[in-house]
Amino acid sequence: MAPSTKATAAKKAVVKGTNGKKALKVRTSASFRLPKTLKLARSPKYATKAVPHYNRLDSYKVIEQPITSETAMKKVEDGNTLVFKVSLKANKYQIKKAVKELYEVDVLSVNTLVRPNGTKKAYVRLTADFDALDIANRIGYI
């Protein structure tokens, strides 16, 4: 009788399958979060751009021209500050770098404002080592 019970047990196992019943996980949240999976670093076969673009805003495009109004001259004489009309797209870091590159001076700070006519003005304060009046003479706007 033993072999038949073994056979019936085997038959039941085949009918049931080997997977058995899986306990269902109770969801307590309405949102389903994907598990964090391995994300490998990219190693492209070729660059997206064949040739990088040339510098769109070099020093000569950043600083357009010095401003020579009376108030600007007062800033040059009293405040050790140079006043320039600059590109609308230039930021303070680019203005500082351009002044340093073009006029070989150290810049203490840069203040900018966009004028009502749509141009940008920059007040470039120089360090105590440099005299704004001498630099303005060297540039040629005094």
Swiss-Prot record:
Q: Which GO terms describe its cellular component?
A: ribonucleoprotein complex; ribosome
Q: Which domain of life is it from?
A: Eukaryota
Q: Which Pfam families match?
A: Ribosomal_L23 (PF00276), Ribosomal_L23eN (PF03939)
- Tagged with keyword Magnesium: no
Q: What keyword terms does UniProt attach to this protein?
A: Ribonucleoprotein, Ribosomal protein, RNA-binding, rRNA-binding
Q: Name one GO biological process term.
A: translation
The molecular function terms in GO held by this entry are: rRNA binding; structural constituent of ribosome
Query: What family does the entry list?
Result: Belongs to the universal ribosomal protein uL23 family.
The name of this protein is Large ribosomal subunit protein uL23
UniProt organism field: Kluyveromyces lactis (strain ATCC 8585 / CBS 2359 / DSM 70799 / NBRC 1267 / NRRL Y-1140 / WM37) (Yeast)
